[in-house]
Amino acid sequence: MNALRGWLAALGSVLLASAAQLGMRWGMSRLPLPEAWAGQTPERAALLAVALAVAAYAASLLCWLAALRHLPLGRAYSLLSASYALVYLLAASLPAFDETFSTSKTLGVGLVVLGVLTVNARRTAAAPAHHPSRKAP
């Protein structure tokens, strides 16, 4: 059950971090450059998107901390790479981002996904599980 909690927390972290990236990109692309902040009134929707993205990053961090409690670092950390694929797919698919698919980007993201799958593949020889809260005999 602890491993399931870890996987769910890692999934939550990936989804929230991906949403944060997209929200930050959408909001920041609609705000003036910092040197023009004094002379312009920023778009409220853009400010809200950036604020929500920052909140999503904070929630993602909390999920990440929960994932680290239940998963080995090497396994959990590789799962964060799934957000690269998710952000790429969504940014290129959604018209709000004006991003495009390309062969080289798709190949690169495919390699990242292959790496995540490789790191998280089940091992054939079961190694004894070690959990930091359990004391060794």
Swiss-Prot record:
GO terms for cellular component: plasma membrane. One of its GO terms (biological process) is transmembrane transport. It is a multi-pass membrane protein. Residues 1-3, 66-76, 122-137 are cytoplasmic. Pathway: Bacterial outer membrane biogenesis; lipopolysaccharide biosynthesis. It is found in: Cell inner membrane. One of its GO terms (molecular function) is carbohydrate derivative transmembrane transporter activity. The keyword Amino-acid biosynthesis does not apply. Disulfide bonds: none annotated. Keywords: Cell inner membrane, Cell membrane, Lipid A biosynthesis, Lipid biosynthesis, Lipid metabolism, Lipopolysaccharide biosynthesis, Membrane, Transmembrane, Transmembrane helix, Transport. The chain crosses the membrane at residues 4-24, 45-65, 77-97, 101-121. Residues 25-44, 98-100 are periplasmic. It comes from the Bacteria. NCBIfam families: PRK02971.1-2. Belongs to the ArnF family. Heterodimer of ArnE and ArnF. Translocates 4-amino-4-deoxy-L-arabinose-phosphoundecaprenol (alpha-L-Ara4N-phosphoundecaprenol) from the cytoplasmic to the periplasmic side of the inner membrane. This is Probable 4-amino-4-deoxy-L-arabinose-phosphoundecaprenol flippase subunit ArnF. It comes from Pseudomonas aeruginosa (strain ATCC 15692 / DSM 22644 / CIP 104116 / JCM 14847 / LMG 12228 / 1C / PRS 101 / PAO1). The gene is arnF.
